[in-house]
Amino acid sequence: MAFLKKSLFLVLFLGLVSLSICEEEKREENEEEQDDDEQSEEKRGFLDIVKGVGKVALGAVSKLFGQEER
């Protein structure tokens, strides 16, 4: 009987350890996904700024060349 109790205790203990390891890995994966999402948002924001600056610069250059041709 004592052998069964020890075996059951060991199985439950190992199950809890593996469960906590799985939860920790899931938590780390979620944090990595959030970091990736934040980085992609930063990249999109930066590209929008560069795109806006490019449009303004292109407009200024086209105005300069348009005035010289007249």
UniProtKB/Swiss-Prot annotation:
Pfam families (alphabetical): FSAP_sig_propep (PF03032)
Subcellular location: Secreted
Gene Ontology terms: biological process: defense response to bacterium; defense response to fungus; killing of cells of another organism
Region forming the signal peptide: 1-22
Residues the record lists as Phenylalanine amide modifications: 65
This protein's record includes keyword Secreted: yes
Domain of life from the UniProt record: Eukaryota
GO cellular component labels: extracellular region
Keywords, alphabetical: Amidation, Amphibian defense peptide, Antibiotic, Antimicrobial, Cleavage on pair of basic residues, Fungicide, Hemagglutinin, Secreted, Signal
Keyword Secreted (UniProt): yes
Propeptide cleavage-removed residue intervals: 23-42, 66-70
Tissue-specific expression: Expressed by the skin glands.
Family named by the database record: Belongs to the frog skin active peptide (FSAP) family. Cruzioseptin subfamily.
Function in brief: Has antimicrobial activity against Gram-negative bacterium E.coli (MIC=15.11 uM), against Gram-positive bacterium S.aureus (MIC=3.77 uM) and against fungus C.albicans (MIC=3.77 uM). At higher concentrations also has a bactericidal and fungicidal effect. Has hemagglutinating activity against horse erythrocytes.
Protein name, entry field: Cruzioseptin-1
Organism: Cruziohyla calcarifer
Source taxonomy: Eukaryota, Metazoa, Chordata, Craniata, Vertebrata
